[in-house]
UniProtKB/Swiss-Prot annotation:
The active site is at E359 (proton donor), H390, K518. Pfam families: PGI (PF00342). This is Glucose-6-phosphate isomerase. Belongs to the GPI family.
Length: 554
């Protein structure tokens, strides 16, 4: 029987019990001492794959820890779960769907059946459609209503229709194609549209409306605003098709909006939004970096898919990262995880991983709807490089919470300035080192004596200078950011999230919590504009509605 049909109490498994006992035995474990005692620790706890290098030696683990965590993966049936996903079985139980974002990066010639139909020809048909459109725009053949070539593309979408594409197009900016600029419009805040449209010309702007249902509130409101702006700037209804295309499974709604059927790129219900950048949702990526580089992105993700399916768990990068997350979240009390990219172009990766992880594993019931017996997904947060060192790293070093971190850094910069990159790389390594080593009371006192302080002042100041250390982190190194390596990196985190969902017995591919806010939002809106006089369900919400209505102008 498939794993998703047999929800388990993971805390009752022998491997979980063994890990609990091991955690108790690890209470006094010191990474500083472990490195001093074992010159091979770095080699034992690091690996390379798909253009990525992972150092996970700065973790609160021994070889026994790793073995016990791998035992847990085996006991929950992880290998069967992986096979089920890649085979197209219905692992999204609450929605009755397979999960096949991995199909989008499989090569020509592969076969994969969904309900008895090989979906791969359709996948590659859409990829060819993307290639054709991108070629026409880059070659100046797609023209606006004034017959001028398109110079700006605006992707209108939110959530997975925005975060993944924005991450990739920004991360691969050094690969950007000249002549076409890509922009993103997500928030329903009118200020975002105002600031964006101020720098655009309607006659040379193409809008991509990305919404699977073509019914997403924020996306439709922004699409209507873009349409109104386009008409006010001199465009006509008759020429609308030159300036609006869609990525949607609702062709009828897109056609009713004014988009020609041949300019509607399909989506499939077996691709979730936060896993959709590999699909036609990635059209703005292809427009930004070209289809050759987009295909390299897909190829890099495919290499990670192969690694994930074939590597033994103790040498499997996504599996190891997932197991470490379980180790800290369920046995060490960690409630959050920091993502710290030391690269300007990767500055948006934290936002994408927030959605990927928190929307996937922010669940409190098992696949069968019964309550979980343990904590599930952590809060994902962080930010770019050295900026964080002068903001929130203080809490990582001396705060009371254990917060594991992933440092992500390239060896080579696209834009070397003097010795800046050497300093950037040095800062990345020194932060992970400082988290691990810390500073003892004796070291703090010796440092203060070296500065000439008297013993009374040393006694007062030393406690403030002590840094506990023993704080875990992973360091992910790439030689240089490229489409292929970025594809592997993003796919790695996708698989990490899936592995954790299997261990906890939850569904990583639905998001019912998001829907409640949408439903309630309709009633709040009606009360704000006066079309519904009935009071809100609670006094707080009604009070805030009254506050708005008493002061809003416009």
């Amino acid at each position: 029987m498939a794993y998703y049909r047999t929800p388990h109490d993971v805390t009752a498994l022998p491997a979980w019990q063994a890990l609990q006992q091991h955690r108790d035995a690890m209470q006094g474990f010191s990474m500083r001492e472990a490195f001093a005692a074992d010159a091979q620790r770095f080699d034992q706890f690091s690996l390379s794959c798909c253009g990525l290098f992972l150092d996970y030696s700065k973790n609160l683990i021994t070889e026994q820890s790793r073995d016990l965590l791998v035992n847990l993966a085996n006991e929950v049936g992880l290998q069967d779960a992986i096979k089920s996903m890649f085979a197209g079985e219905i692992i999204n139980a609450s929605e009755g769907r397979p999960v096949l974002h991995t199909a989008l990066r499989r090569p020509v010639g592969d076969k994969l059946s969904v309900n008895g139909v090989n979906v791969m020809p359709e996948v590659h048909k859409v990829l060819n459609q993307i290639t054709e459109l991108v070629g026409r725009i880059h070659d100046g053949l797609w023209r606006g209503y004034s017959e001028k070539p398109i110079t700006d593309v605006v992707n209108i979408g939110i959530g997975g229709s925005f975060l993944g594409p924005e991450l990739v197009s920004e991360a691969l900016l050094p690969y950007a194609q000249r002549g076409v600029r890509c922009h993103y419009l997500a928030n329903i805040d009118g200020s975002e549209f105002h600031e964006l449209s101020a720098n655009l010309r309607a006659e040379t702007t193409l809008f991509i409306v990305s919404s699977k249902s073509f019914n997403t509130l924020e996306t439709l409101k922004n699409a209507m605003a873009a349409r109104t702006w386009y008409l006010a700037q001199g465009g006509s209804e008759a020429e609308l098709y030159r300036h609006f295309i869609a990525v949607s499974s609702n062709k009828a709604a897109a056609v009713a909006f004014g988009i020609r059927e041949e300019n509607i790129f399909p989506m499939w219900d077996w691709v979730g939004g936060r896993y959709s950048l590999w699909s036609a949702i990635g059209l703005p990526i292809a427009l930004a970096i070209g289809t050759a580089n987009f295909k390299e992105l897909l190829s890099g993700a495919y290499t990670m898919d192969q690694h994930f399916q074939t590597a033994p768990f103790d040498k499997n990068m996504p599996v190891l990262l997932a197991l470490l997350g379980v180790w800290y979240g369920n046995f060490w009390g960690a409630n959050s995880h920091a993502i710290l990219p030391y690269d300007h172009y990767l500055r948006n990766i934290t936002k994408h991983l927030q959605q990927l992880d928190m929307e996937s594993n922010g669940k409190s019931v098992l696949q069968d709807g019964t309550p979980v017996k343990t904590d599930t997904g952590p809060v994902i947060w962080g930010g770019v490089g050295c900026n964080g060192q002068h903001a929130y790293h203080q809490l990582l070093h001396q705060g009371t919470q254990l917060i594991p971190a992933d440092f992500i850094v390239p060896v080579v910069s696209f834009n070397p300035v003097a010795d800046h990159h050497q300093w950037l790389y040095a800062n990345c390594l020194s932060q992970s080192q400082a988290l691990m080593l810390g500073k003892t009371r004796e070291e703090a006192e010796a440092e203060l004596r070296g500065k000439g302080l008297n013993e009374a002042d040393i006694e007062k100041l030393a406690p403030h200078k002590v840094i506990p250390g023993n704080r875990p982190s992973n360091t992910l190194v790439v030689e240089r950011i490229s489409p292929r390596r970025l594809g592997a990196l993003v796919a790695m985190y996708e698989h990490k999230v899936f592995v954790q969902s299997v261990i906890w017995g939850i569904n990583a591919f639905d998001q019912w919590g998001v829907e409640l806010g949408k439903e309630l939002g309709k009633g709040v809106y009606q009360r704000l504009v006066g079309s519904l006089e009935e009071s809100a369900e609670d006094g707080s919400t009604q009070g805030l509605i009254n506050y708005f209505r008493g002061r809003h102008r416009g």
